[in-house]
Each structure stands twice: as C-alpha cells, then as structure tokens.
C-alpha cells in the first residue's frame, strides 16, 4: 500500500469495527465492510452515497511489471469495473489498443463473442480483461497460458468458474495463476480463503 492507502485503510478499518460492534450484524453488513476495505487496496474509497474517490495505489504498476515478464496470452480478472477501465487505459498506452479485448458489464452484448474469437485467434491480441461476474461463466479462453487476478471478490464459485475459463477442452498448455495482493490487508485473507476453497460469504 502507498502511505495514502495505509492511512485511509486504517481509518476505514476503525470505522468498520465501530459499525460491526454497534449493531446486529448481518452477512451483508459484514461483507460490505470487507469489500470497502478491499476497494481501498485497489485504489478506491467508496462513500455511503455510492460515489467513489481514487486513492494513490501501486497495484496498476505491479500489474504492468508482471506483464513485462509474461509471455503468451493473458486473462486479467478484476473485481471492479473501475479497475477494468484503468487496466485498459494502461494497456493501450503500453501495448496499443489492438493488444486487448474486454468482457465485463459495459461490454456490449453484440460484441462479446467477437472479442472472444479475437482473443482466441488473433496473435496481436494478447490480453482479455474482464470481471468474474460477467466473463467467468461459460466462455472458452484456452489460448491463455497465464491468468492474473488483479483483485478478487469473496465468492468462491466465481473464482473457480473464472479459473476454468482457461482450462476448457482444447487447452494444451500449463496455465499459471497469479494473485496481486496488498500485504497485511484484507487482500491476504480473501486470497487465503479462496485458495483453501472456503466461500467467505457462507462463513461470515
């Protein structure tokens, strides 16, 4: 985390504890507080009115550094639409607009199959960026040999389904999975639970 992120994260953590100590908690209340902390690790602060404010973050730089050391085609999963937009801007700047396609909530329905075909068949298209909520189900992305989780949600099924996009019939390569994690934050807890096949939503 950057110094600014650490400051905001600790403030939000104290606020979350106060909220959880001050009322009868529901699963949704707990998950909301967890995801607010998680958003800070990704560079955003979410307000009660639904607006978001950016906080200086190293995560995008870390992603670009990982991509420099990665060969072949790559699936990049992000939990938030704002992250997808940021990643697309960074890829356009470094690799060009033809280097990627996207598959998330703002991707037009009529373009989605064309984008999958482009990723699978066009050598110039190295990256597909999406959210597990939208792109994690039912599509085949077997040309990828690397899957990067820019950020994770707490839903185990979405994680497992998104992992399987590169492991469909026709995959002949070994697939490498990479999680970007902010140390000493909720990030570590989320990824640890997902790797242990624990559905956080059902454990709260």
Give the role of each language-model region.
Residues 154-204:
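A conserved SF2-helicase RecA2
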Residues 1-139:
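Conserved Helicase C-terminal RecA-like lobe
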Residues 41-44, 145, 181:
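Short, histidine-centered active-site or binding-site loop motifs used for metal coordination
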């Amino acid at each position: 985390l950057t110094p600014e992120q650490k400051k905001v994260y600790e403030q939000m953590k104290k606020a979350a504890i106060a909220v959880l100590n001050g009322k009868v908690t529901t699963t949704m209340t707990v998950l909301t507080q967890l995801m607010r902390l998680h958003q800070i690790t990704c560079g955003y602060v979410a307000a009660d009115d639904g607006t978001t404010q950016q906080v200086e973050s190293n995560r995008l730089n870390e992603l670009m550094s990982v991509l420099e050391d990665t060969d072949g085609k790559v699936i990049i999963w992000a939990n938030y639409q704002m992250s997808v937009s940021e990643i697309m801007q960074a890829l356009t700047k470094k690799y060009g607009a033809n280097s990627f396609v996207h598959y998330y909530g703002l991707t037009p329905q009529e373009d989605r199959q064309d984008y999958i075909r482009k990723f699978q068949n066009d050598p110039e298209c190295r990256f597909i960026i999406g959210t597990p909520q939208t792109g994690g189900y039912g599509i085949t992305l077997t040309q990828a040999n690397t899957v990067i989780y820019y950020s994770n949600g707490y839903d185990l099924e979405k994680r497992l389904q998104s992992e399987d996009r590169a492991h469909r019939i026709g995959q002949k390569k070994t697939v490498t999975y990479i999680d970007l994690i902010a140390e000493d934050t909720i990030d570590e807890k989320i990824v640890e639970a997902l790797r242990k096949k624990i559905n956080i939503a059902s454990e709260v």
